[in-house]
């Protein structure tokens, strides 16, 4: 084997290793995306939904998505 062939094989092995490790990272990034989505509406978990029998706390109102939000900001 000449030097160029060794370099090509080394690059292929490195690409294979990167592909395998990035696939493992993708599954954990899905979990992170789910956590980020949960973090977008922090009041919904804390105050709950507006669906009966649960009601919003007095200083909040129910929006169209049935989530308790601040009346002025809608968040």
Curated annotation (Swiss-Prot):
Disulfide pairings: 50-62, 56-68
The record's GO CC annotations read: extracellular region
Keyword entries, A-Z = Disulfide bond, Secreted, Signal, Toxin
Q: Name one GO molecular function term.
A: toxin activity
Q: What transmembrane ranges does the database entry give?
A: none
Instruction: Tell me the leader sequence span.
Output: 1-19
**Localization per Swiss-Prot or TrEMBL:** Secreted
Domain of life of the organism in this record?
Answer: Eukaryota
The main place the protein resides is secreted
Q: In which tissues is it expressed?
A: Expressed by the venom gland.
Q: What does this protein do?
A: Insecticidal toxin.
Q: What is this protein called?
A: Insecticidal toxin OcyC10
């Amino acid at each position: 084997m000449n030097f160029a062939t060794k370099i090509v094989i080394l690059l292929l092995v490195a690409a294979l290793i990167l592909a395998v490790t990035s696939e493992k990272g993708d599954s954990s990034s899905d979990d992170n995306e789910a956590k980020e989505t949960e973090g977008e509406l922090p009041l919904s978990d804390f105050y709950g939904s507006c669906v009966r029998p649960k009601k919003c706390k007095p200083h909040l109102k129910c929006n169209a998505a049935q989530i308790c939000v601040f009346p002025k900001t809608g968040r």
